[in-house]
Structures are given as C-alpha cells and as structure tokens.
UniProtKB/Swiss-Prot annotation:
Residues 1-105, 116-231 form the C2 domain. Ca(2+) 4 binds at residues 149, 202, 204, 210. Probable inhibitory regulator of the Ras-cyclic AMP pathway. Plays a role in dendrite formation by melanocytes. CDD domains: RasGAP_RASAL. A zinc finger (Btk-type) spans 674-710. This is RasGAP-activating-like protein 1. Its cofactor is Ca(2+). It comes from Mus musculus. PROSITE patterns: C2 (PS50004), PH_DOMAIN (PS50003), RAS_GTPASE_ACTIV_1 (PS00509), RAS_GTPASE_ACTIV_2 (PS50018), ZF_BTK (PS51113). The record marks 341 as: Arginine finger. The gene is Rasal1. GO terms for molecular function: GTPase activator activity; zinc ion binding. It comes from the Eukaryota. Residues 565-672 form the PH domain. Ca(2+) 2 binds at residues 21, 74, 76, 82.
Amino acid sequence: MAKSGSLSIRVVEGRALPAKDVSGSSDPYCLVKVDDQVVARTATIWRSLSPFWGEEYTVHLPLDFHHLAFYVLDEDTVGHDDIIGKISLSKEAITADPRGIDSWINLSRVDPDAEVQGEVCLDVKLLEDARGRCLRCHVRQARDLAPRDISGTSDPFARVFWGNHSLETSTIKKTRFPHWDEVLELREAPGTTSPLRVELWDWDMVGKNDFLGMVEFTPQTLQQKPPNGWFRLLPFPRAEDSGGSLGALRLKVRLTEDRVLPSQYYQPLMELLLESVQGPAEEDTTSPLALLEELASGDCRQDLATKLVKLFLGRGLAGPFLDYLTRREVARTNDPNTLFRSNSLASKSMEQFMKLVGMRYLHEVLRPVISRVFEEKKYMELDPCKMDLNRSRRISFKGTPTEEQVRETSLGLLTGYLGSVVDAIVSSTGRCPLALRLAFKQLQRCVEKRFSGIEHQDVKYLAISGFLFLRFFAPAILTPKLFDLRDQHADPQTSRSLLLLAKAVQSIGNLGQQLGQGKEQWLAPLHPFLLQSISRVRDFLDQLVDVDEDEEAGGPACALVQPSTIVREGFLLKRKEEPGGLATRFAFKKRYFRLSGRDLSYSKTPEWQVHTSIPLSCIRAVEHVDEGAFQLPHVMQVVTQDGAGTSHTTYLQCKNVNDLNQWLSALRKASAPNPGKLVACHPGAFRSGRWTCCLQAERSAAGCSRTHSAITLGDWSDPLDPDAEAQAVYRQLLLGRDQLRLKLLEDSSLDTEVDPGRDSSATDGPCAEVLAQQRAATTHLLQVLEDLEQAHEEFQKRG
C-alpha cells in the first residue's frame, strides 16, 4: 500500500511586525521550511509592517514528516537579513482539526537552542554484573546537524548522561555529518534506574559551546527495547512563548494524508464513475458524480474538481467527463447570461482542466508581453481619480503634465501592450493543446443546442471565452506569479498596469457586452480598440473549435507531460564532477537548460543548435548541495548512472531559493518512475582527498545524507496517478456518507408514499421508478464505500 501526503499552504499576510530599518519600517519576506528543508520563499514586501503576500504552495511529502515552520525575515541589501520571528507547527497541531489551520498566529522569538535538526545513530546495551549495572552506548554517527559556524559547518561532539555520570566523545571539526564510532561505558549503583540522555554540541574555541540537539530514553525503554538505530534530535524542553510583540501571520495550512490501495480495490468505484459519464446527464440524480456534486461544499469543490479531472485524464476520458458536467449545467440553466458564472463542479472542473493541460500554452502566449510590462515599468493610468501627475512627470515628461496628456500617453501604452496580448492570443490556435480544443468544441455544441435562437447567437462564443479569457488569460495577467509567469509579485505601479490590462482582456472576453455600463466610464477611450479586437476574437474562437473530433488527445490515457513538452527552462551555472579536479566556484559555466518529458538538455544559449542531453531514465538522485561545498548558495546536484553502472554527478547553481526548489521539484517528478533511486548521497563535494560533508576519504564512500525524492512542489506538471485520485474521491464520498444514508432513508420514505394504483406520470412527487433507481444507486455506492473501508482496515492491520 503506497503512502502519500501533501501540505496545502497559504501565506496570507502579516500584521504589527517590528521595524528593523532606520526608516521605521521593514522589508519582510517569509521562508517556509518542512523538517528544516526550505521549500519556498515569498516575495519581499518593501517598506511594510503589515505585508500582504497571498502566496499558495502545495508540497508533496512523505508521511513521516514532523513539523512545518515559517520564518519571517527583513531583507537587507547590505549584510545579513534580520530574523524577525518564527512560527513552528507540529504535524499533530496541523491535523488536530480535519479542516486544517486558518487563523492568525503570533510570531515567537528564534531561540538558537531550539533551532535543532538532524539525527544521531546509537546502539545502546544495558548490562549487569557483580558490580552493578553498566550502560554501553555506541555513538556511531550523526547526520544533517544544524550549521553553527560561519563556514556553514559545525565542530560536533556528543555528551552522554546516565545517572550521576557523563562522558564525551571526541570533537570532529568542520562537519555536519560526523562519524565517531566510539563506545562509552557508564556505571550505576545497584537498585537505581535512570534515564539516558545524549546531547550533541558544537565546540567553540571562544565563548560557550552551541547546542545541536538531544535525545532521551526512559528507564523502561532501556530495559524493554534498548535503542538501536537513527533518532531525531530534539530541542531542550522550554516554556512556550505566547508571542504577540513580534507581530503575527495569517496562515492557512491543511495536511492531506492518504494510504493508496492497489489498483484493483478501486475498480468498483471507477466503474461507477465511468458509468456516470456514459449515461444521460440532463436529469441524472442517481450517479456517483451527481451525488458527489450534491455533497461537495463550496470550500472543497475546487479540490474535488482537480482530483476528478486528473482521474479521468489518467483514464483518457477527460472529454466525456467534461461533456457530462457541461450537459448537466446547461440543462439546469435558463438564463444564458448566468451560464457557467457560478462556482459549480462543471465550472471548476473546466477551469482546472485548462490549468492542467494548458499551462504550457498559457506561458507561450503571455510570457513575452508580461515580461515587457515588468521590465519596462511604464506608468499607465486612465482613471482620473488615481492619476499621479508627479509620477508621470518623473517618468514621461519634462514639465508638469495635464490629465489629458497622461491619459493620451497611457492610452498609447495600454493599447500597445493590449495589442500584443490580442495578437499573441488570436495567432495561437496551432499551439493550443488538442485536448483543450476538443473540450471547447463539445462545450460549444452543447450550448448551441440549448440556446439556438438568433437572439442567442453570441452565447456559443461567450461560453468558451468565459473560460479561456475570464478564468485563464485575465487571472494570469492580473497575478502572473501565481501562474508561474514571474518569480516575484509585481510592485504597486506594475500591478496597476497589469490590472488595467486584465480589465481590458475581460471586456474582450465578454465580447463587449458590458462596455459603457457600470462605474468605470474612464475606460471609454479604450472602447474603440476593444470593439476592434472582439471581431478578431470571434474568428479565433471559430478556428479554435475547428478540429477533427476523431483525433485523439494524447492516446488512450492522456499524460500531462509528453516527451517533447518543455516542463522548465532557463539559465543555470553548471559544473561536472571531475576526479582530481579542483572544486572551485570558477569551474561553473553558464548554460541554458531545458527539462522535457524525455531528458535534461543544455547548451550555451537558447538558440544554440549543439546541446548535451541527460536522459531522465539515468537519474538516480536530485538533491541540495551544502553552501560550503563550493562557497556558493542555491546549488543542487543531479546524480546519474550510465549503462556500465558508473555514477556521475552534475552540479547546478540556481539564481535563488525558489528557482532551486522549482528545479529540484521538476527533476524529481520527471525521474520519479526510475528504478534504483539512491536512498543516500553526499551533500558536499569531494576535494582535497575527502568529502567536505562527512570528511570520508573514499570517493566511493556511501552517502551520508538521506535523499528527499518524495518532497516536491505541486503544480501543473504533477504526474497523473489514477489510484491516488480515486483514493481522494473515495475520501470525499466517505465524508458525505452520513448524508448518503439520510438520502437513502428519505428516498425509501417517499417511495412508500407513492400510491401503487395511481399512474406515476400523474404523481406530483418523484415517480416510483426514479425513486427506485436513486435508492439502488445509493445502496450500491454505500456498499462500494464499505468495501473500500474494510480493505483499508485490513491493510492497516498488516502494516
């Protein structure tokens, strides 16, 4: 039984942060750590004590993780960043409420003695002889200790306490992965029982030693199950700091843990779901999909939609699934102006489908224009209430401009950017994924059939543009970081420019139906350009759905990442491991990397025809590298194995911590199916005849640090896993099981009220046949859920 977990994290905002700069303000950002591994960094909000981030992350991780931490720092352009405070959440605290955490949490001070990490390997034996008890503690090694020295390492030693006695190991200099292999023996008087405590310290020549962590074992543990293995280091027990003086963060955190059964156990549920999409949708109230839509609340509907879309994508049935939901939605809609405007399961499913299969397409269309807006930083404003004439003067004019001058200049800039956006969209038909085009064609046909009158001639266009423009292009323009179009959020001026562009794209997506209405009359100068663009968009939508329905969108089961699909690309600094070579920072060379569904390739420039490729099937590990290995930050390693079984390591330096984590995540997901993955590797470099991490002298020595192949960031390129998605659907149905049982009772009571001698067609309530179908479908579904629940219990007992 496979085990998986994912953390949904939203860093919303901060309040009442302390000032760290002489100006009386701060430049705060937030680091997100999972078990001491940095997985994300928010943008820096300049000159603010109440920053708004609004950043979301999904982290896939193993079930044995321990804690999640948020560190708030003040960015300094010179010197080290100042630590403001931290929030630490244990796994138990996150799972205490099934809905997760959604609240303001006070920041607490960062106590160096509480900042511990890593593990220690011990083998403890309790012996008895005529002189009393003897405890033999074999201190083997430790790994991933906290760096306490400026070099990014420590000088660790272990101190063992038992009763009134204590002993120390030797000190090993400049390593976070010490190998002691020392046996310490302590004696205790007969008749006494004492706990065992092992502390790790960093030795300092000047000043006091720094605490690295501790483990403690009760007398009962020593007697019944003497410790032997790896043990996680813990901080000294201390009183909790209620905080408040350092400000607070508003966080949303939810942990989802699943134990995924073998595929055959989900087959009955899958058959029920597949039967749903193959049956009539308009009056369906009995299928599992119809019941799921009824049970799903607004809060979880988006997550459910994502799981269902992925499940049917993995089965090659995303088209029929979306068509089923579309037919249900259209049949229930009387006013075409409200079609797909709600957050129904149909709307959310189509929205998630666009993000899953169309993200690469979105990047190709919008990235060039978005990059121009960020880089050129032009001032644009049409609203006279928001015009800043002084800013316009600094940027565009020699003298003091008038509102009319600002409006004319802004209109020219805005139409220029908007023209580039429209040109990119209407010329992108050939780049739009086939699966998306087929889904839009089915959508248009269904809408056209329902609203066929001449007065509804635009509805077939609005149905598509409502998704493609209003739920895809416009949100990506408004918040490009959330769609991975930029690494940072926009500054206020650029954000306003993006808002104006997004409003214009929304107006085009609405086919100009609301032009001249509402309070934003200041957009009137833009109307001629918008009306001109709308006719081009209609032609584009006609071309988009002009596709042969017999074509298959990626075969029987559609993969999100095809072999030729570029998942990630950009410049990195590269260095290959060379036996006998000098591990210096000058050995890194700038290369342009592309990660596809087939390989990791690189060349001197993006246009360079000659490139070197690393097949994904050869990758055995993708891991962080300690900063001290090359005196460089943000370095990772890709460990590969050739046909002869020889290992090779390529070191890559990324531009920042987010770039590093995104490359790590993308490479780990791309190489996830590979056999023979390494369970440990070296986070350092081999130079001067030894590894910089663990100081071992053999180049071929076994790795000293565990690999983290299971830790990845969730995004559109996540591999499809139908079993995991089926498990998520089962979990959602399980939450609504009581409602299903209540529905079954209601249907049964209604059925008894139907007069058998009366024609069912004349009955005011539901007919007997429909009630019987509902009761049978609900009973069948409840039985499937019960069978799955029993299977989980059986596997739980075995494990």
